[in-house]
């Protein structure tokens, strides 16, 4: 959409352009925001902390909030036919893109197997999208992993998250929803090594998770790249489960 706005502005400079969801200038190194000023007349911001970046360049902006934090639950659904009432829930978010699922799902499946070896009172729920539910289900069905459900219904996912004891999530704005539900969590992410090196050269932030970025410190633990492995995830989750006062 930024390219469209730039093209429209080049054709007719008098057309006013309003962009919903600010370009993440706080992620990338300096310089990009000056370019946006040339073809964006107003920006609608999801996060209040973004204002300072656009105010600095005198780009008109308005903070409108994030829709994930404003969604209301619909009618309550009986989850007993999905999750056993005597099981604690750990919600898992392996990403929306197939490339993310392909990379993170095997790691999470191995983590679940490790948990099942030591504990018998947990159910693991993958929060899928309509687009990737089949991909996740097929990969899980090709393993011997137990105590796993894959859910794509938005209302059911929200209620399951609200009942969760813990969450393991790919970095992204879903961490806001997890935080809003007051569910303790850790953030994981992994990409191929070449892409990781490229990103390291381009980005200027220290954290992968939006909550940590906003606060400029690690509030939610992050397991990135080589630390994103079944053993580290298992150790982190078990540590917090055994020390609930830290959650």
Language model features: what each stretch is:
Residues 1-247:
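Nucleotide-activated sugar donor-binding and catalytic core shared by glycosyltransferases
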